[in-house]
Regions:
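Zinc-dependent deaminase catalytic domain
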Residues: 1-416
């Protein structure tokens, strides 16, 4: 990019331009820009891509539940950091049209960027209560958020005072009431319809057929095996009650991830029939926010997106008859999200963005874990979930829980 911003107004307007592009794409109307604090240079500007056309096809739009502008900017930075000789994250600011959600706030804190914000999101934003105390952020990270996040002042007739840290690009500055209102209203005009389309993008399991019974030459079956070569190798008789049958997959995947420099963790995804469709580790060696959960939810969404837009109608119909929204499946992680870290906040937020609304069956939870990180209790994990912004606690009702099968817990623990 060659654009430069001389002040907060110009920076937010660059991001606002991206939010307009997002609105025209019929996805969440949010945009962001990565600014070099010293020069004001716009290094990267991206908008939300949760819903996106597939090669001009509009048949199925749910592309990536984690493709919020801020998350994409973080991954863009780590992908291009060496090639472009980019400054350290602490010398850069992500300027966003909307208060980051839990996932994006966790991603930004993990990466170490400064953050400048225009509009508030009282439902899913990390500063939802507008008190600047960040109750959803792990306690030891709240002071970090208070020094690295900023909410620009707004001129008359809004008259909002600047609140935030001094390290953010264009600290202490204001933006126009016009720009502030644009960034808020354009998001509000899109949010409910996008959430509804996402949350309802799949059939009830009672109307599905088991993908395990697909013929070997099925395009859908091949796509699932391409995403995870061991798909269908394990079946849990009761998908919400996973047992020892998934222990080996979780452990082996975590070990492989760790050997290449990622965290020792893995996440399995079981479909409504109990089939193990995915079990992936993270890619933190590439980007610190590419955790195992992020990799799994993105892989499942991408596979559906490609298949549901396939040029062959019979493939599309078959995909729609065997694959559905992940709210009907079960995510099982080897280790729970760590409530003491921003990665933990990000993971719970990403789960909320994956569900994007109510879950039909809330018990047992469809967000489960086998083991707890050292020094973390089940109560700690639940406390973080209950402290998330209202969208996550009232609509999604995020409720991570430990698997109920003691044999699975013991087998994995004894194999470490």
């Amino acid at each position: 990019m060659t654009k430069k911003a001389a002040n907060a107004e110009q920076a937010v307007r660059i991001a606002a331009g991206k939010s307009i592009e997002a609105s025209l794409q019929n996805t969440f109307a949010v945009g962001g820009v990565l600014i070099d604090n010293r020069s004001g240079t716009a290094l990267c500007a991206l908008h939300n891509n949760v819903l996106e056309d597939f090669e001009n096809s509009k048949l199925f739009l749910l592309h990536d539940p984690t493709a919020h502008g801020e998350r994409q900017i973080v991954d863009w930075y780590f992908k291009n950091r060496k090639r472009l000789n980019l400054p350290d994250p602490g010398k850069l600011s992500v300027i966003t049209t909307l208060d980051p959600c839990a996932m994006c706030a966790g991603a930004l804190l993990t990466a170490g960027f400064n953050v400048g914000v225009s509009a508030i999101d009282n439902y899913a934003g990390i500063n939802y209560n507008e008190a600047f105390d960040f109750p959803s952020v792990p306690s030891r990270w709240r002071s970090v958020a208070q020094s690295s996040f900023a909410y620009y002042g707004v001129e008359a007739p809004i008259r909002r005072a600047y609140r935030g840290g001094k390290r953010v690009a264009f600290a202490k500055q204001t933006i126009s009431a016009f720009t502030f209102c644009l960034t808020g209203t354009i998001f509000e005009s899109s949010v409910n319809s996008v959430r509804a389309l996402d949350n309802n993008s799949g059939q009830d399991p009672s109307k599905l057929t088991n993908p395990k019974n697909l013929p070997r030459n099925s395009t859908v079956r091949k796509a699932l095996l391409d995403a995870y070569p061991e798909a269908f190798s394990v079946t849990c008789p009761k998908p919400r009650l996973p047992g020892t049958e998934i222990a080996r997959a979780l452990l082996n995947t975590a070990k492989k991830a760790h050997r290449r420099g990622a965290a020792f963790n893995s996440v399995a995804f079981l479909d409504p029939f109990g089939n193990l469709l995915l079990c992936l580790g993270g890619a933190e060696e590439r980007s610190p926010i590419r955790t195992a959960f992020m990799e799994v939810t993105r892989a499942y969404a991408h596979t559906r997106w490609v298949l549901m837009n396939h040029r062959d109608k019979s493939v599309r119909e078959q995909a729609g008859n065997v694959l559905t929204h992940p709210k009907y499946g079960t995510f099982v992680s080897l280790y729970s999200p760590d409530p003491n870290t921003p990665q933990g906040l990000m993971t719970m937020g990403a789960y909320g963005s994956t569900m994007e609304g109510p879950i039909p069956e809330t018990f047992p939870s469809n967000l489960q874990y086998v083991l707890l990180p050292e020094g973390v209790s089940q109560a700690d994990v639940s406390e973080m979930a209950m402290g998330l912004p209202p969208f996550y606690t009232t609509s999604v009702q995020v409720a991570p829980s430990q698997v109920l099968d003691e044999g699975l817990i013991e087998e994995t623990r004894s194999s470490l």
